[in-house]
Amino acid sequence: MEQICLIILLISKALSVGAQFNGYNCDANFHSRFPAERDISVYCGVQTITLKINFCPVLFSGYTDTDLALNGRHGDAHCRGFINNNTFPTVVLFSISLATLETCGNALVVSTAQGPNAYGNLSLVQIGNISGYIDTPDPPTIISYLPGLLYKFSCSYPLEYLVNNTQLASSAAAISVKDSNGTFVSTLSLLLYNDSSYVQQLSIPMAGLTLKTRVFAAVKATNLDRRWNVLMDYCYTTASGNPNDELRYDLFFSCDKDPQTTVFENGKSQMGRFAFEVFRFVKHKNQKMSTVFLHCVTKLCRADDCPMLMPICGSRKKRDVSERTESNSASGNAIITAGPIITRSDDTPMNNSQLAQLNSPVFRMNTVTSALISGIIILGVMSLCFFILSLTLLKGKRAPPTILSGARNPAFN
């Protein structure tokens, strides 16, 4: 009888463990525990960052794969991982592209460190550190018996891996528009350029852009007919790639505009254009370089109705009319992002000679030392003058007497 009870107990335990891990490649002897730091593996690749999380302790803690998301973005399917059950143990994979770091709110911090440059010489090198976390959502209740899971990660790269000299990372947004012919989808993109010709995309050197460099931005739309134009509601900047970052600076918003920002075209065609001067965020005061991300809240409007949707400063009545017509003549808003724009402070070295000057020791004399050296120089000059004068006088005393020549006068005898 005891043997039968033992067999029943073992079977029930096996069934409970199997139900707990739901058929995933997990071992109850090793994975019946809460997650630990060793459960995450980070692979810092050239193009992507790959994160692997041991899924078995996550299941044991009472969560599923849909509960894990990057940087708290649980409502965004692009910020979740996917299960790989072909390995032991089963893992949840996250892939982060270096070209779209801002998509799920990963943080990018640029610092300067001493190391070998592209030529193998020891100099100051700019390093970009990418960091973030994977967590589970907070429960809607006041208390919870489930542990909150948190996995942190970071990767460091030379800056040339993150900011290519020929192009910048930019995001695109698909926006749905409904008209009399049905519903169509247009793609909005935000691009940065070197000059007002809007031909060559912005090129950022490894050392970063100098402050007050003028950058030209354009919001473009695809798959549009002539009846629709692009309308930029407002554009702003953040220190991170997160458009919802609390630390932000508005370039233009309604009738308010940054003095260094110029809007060339808005609501008049299928492209919005403006320019601004780059700056640094004060929070980066202890860093040689600062990161700036540009965000624009954009919509599509009918070409005939766009002027009514534009902010008309000083005329509240016209603005009220536009608000009433907005729902019928414009699409919803879309946020598009470009960056990072890397800026440098004025004391950031630009070339190898400046780097050498930074690395070489600087010799400074105090007031007493400089006065002593000046006195010695003056005394030496006076001694030299006295020596020359003495030689001149001595030569005059040693000169032979003058011998007169001519005929003798007998009158003096």
Swiss-Prot record:
The keyword Magnesium does not apply. Proteolytically cleaved before the transmembrane segment to yield the secreted form found in the extracellular matrix of the cupula. Residues 20-370 are extracellular. Keywords: Cytoplasmic vesicle, Disulfide bond, Extracellular matrix, Glycoprotein, Membrane, Pyrrolidone carboxylic acid, Secreted, Signal, Transmembrane, Transmembrane helix. The modification Pyrrolidone carboxylic acid is found at Q20. Residues 43-320 form the ZP domain. Pfam families: Zona_pellucida, ZP-N. The chain crosses the membrane at residues 371-391. The keyword Ubl conjugation does not apply. The record marks R319, D320 as: Cleavage. Glycans are attached at N85, N121, N129, N164, N181, N194, N351. GO terms for cellular component: collagen-containing extracellular matrix; cytoplasmic vesicle membrane; extracellular region. Coiled coil: none annotated. Residues 392-413 are cytoplasmic. Detected in the acellular cupulae of the vestibular organ, and also in support cells adjacent to the cupula (at protein level). Residues 1-19 form the signal peptide. Glycoprotein which is a component of the gelatinous extracellular matrix in the cupulae of the vestibular organ. This is Zona pellucida-like domain-containing protein 1. The lineage of its organism: Eukaryota, Metazoa, Chordata, Craniata, Vertebrata.
